[in-house]
């Protein structure tokens, strides 16, 4: 084990000098001896002359020049396997839930090669989520990648929590949750929500929160992914939730300038596409098992053309776009049915009926969108009878796309609903064909299946 000395500290970036014949490799983990505190550094660059530039996986407070640094001769390694279920860990795989050691049988390095082309599998199986708007408009594939796009406060984390709850209870698989640069309060709420739903023993939680140094936020997604890869390689279907992928990019931006790189567009790191690719290419399904991933993506200033969300788009099978305009109408989940897409929405995958209903719903909502200007200027009375019918059905569809969530029961006061895909299709097909034209709009708001609409209408 070679020993070096710190020669420079700038924020989260630390330069260490080693003997010329014992220079650490890129991505090797180094350990700083700083009293009782042990700090791990990760080598990013070799500057020549035995000097390496590293990122600190923790606070660099209290570091000074001349401190001894040991090379561990391997990348950061984290515990994997069943011992991690029900536990909360940090970027280094250390427990932070005060429940003692993890007691793992195996540790894996967080930097791994993506599976080779021969190992990949192509699945067309659908994953039912029980959320009407998602199952109908942007269905998820088992082993696919899904992005939840939205600005601040439109419900990315709540949607994510509902998906985890539904999938854990209805499909009883293992999940890994990587909290990347999100609020500590949300991490706490999330843990208690999982405990209350009795699914905590099927979830591994890895947190690198907002208040932590950029090194933690940059690597915590890889820690969570490594745990998910272990479950996949055991032949399981595992779910990987990342909240929030934008903070992963942002952490890279924070350290990029300190590492001496020139910034690119909007101040992002020049290696943005490569960093995203390294992470996303590992999130994939092989012939032994599958990783289905759901990633929340913060959209800065609601601008989907920002380099960070734009780079993420390229890697996804389905995109769920949350809209501030729909949220302001009080319709939750605030998914935009015209903006959200999925590769699975194909008659060969979902079947002709599902495809026709989804496209029919989109065309009615699109027509309503076009008529809104006329209604705003001239009023409803100036529309033709046919257009009045379209508007009436569109407003019912819009309300029927809302749904009470299990994880939001505390706020809404109404019990959550899980709606099977066949009931979702039946409901929207009925609205489009005019079977429910006689029912009032309010009956369609915040309910589960179409049968509940009929019941609710009787009480109104």
Swiss-Prot record:
It catalyses: ATP + H2O + 4 H(+)(in) = ADP + phosphate + 5 H(+)(out). Belongs to the ATPase alpha/beta chains family. It comes from Pectobacterium carotovorum subsp. carotovorum (strain PC1). F-type ATPases have 2 components, CF(1) - the catalytic core - and CF(0) - the membrane proton channel. CF(1) has five subunits: alpha(3), beta(3), gamma(1), delta(1), epsilon(1). CF(0) has three main subunits: a(1), b(2) and c(9-12). The alpha and beta chains form an alternating ring which encloses part of the gamma chain. CF(1) is attached to CF(0) by a central stalk formed by the gamma and epsilon chains, while a peripheral stalk is formed by the delta and b chains. InterPro entries: AAA+_ATPase (IPR003593), ATP-synt_VA_C (IPR055190), ATP_synth_F1_bsu (IPR005722), ATPase_a/bsu_AS (IPR020003), ATPase_alpha/beta_chains (IPR050053), ATPase_F1/V1/A1_a/bsu_N (IPR004100), ATPase_F1/V1/A1_a/bsu_N_sf (IPR036121), ATPase_F1/V1/A1_a/bsu_nucl-bd (IPR000194). It is found in: Cell inner membrane. GO terms for cellular component: plasma membrane; proton-transporting ATP synthase complex. ATP binds at residues 150-157. Keywords: ATP synthesis, ATP-binding, Cell inner membrane, Cell membrane, CF(1), Hydrogen ion transport, Ion transport, Membrane, Nucleotide-binding, Translocase, Transport. SUPFAM superfamilies: C-terminal domain of alpha and beta subunits of F1 ATP synthase, N-terminal domain of alpha and beta subunits of F1 ATP synthase, P-loop containing nucleoside triphosphate hydrolases. Produces ATP from ADP in the presence of a proton gradient across the membrane. The catalytic sites are hosted primarily by the beta subunits. PANTHER family: ATP SYNTHASE (PTHR15184), ATP SYNTHASE SUBUNIT BETA, MITOCHONDRIAL (PTHR15184:SF71). GO terms for molecular function: ATP binding; ATP hydrolysis activity; proton-transporting ATP synthase activity, rotational mechanism. This is ATP synthase subunit beta. It is a peripheral membrane protein. Its EC number is 7.1.2.2.
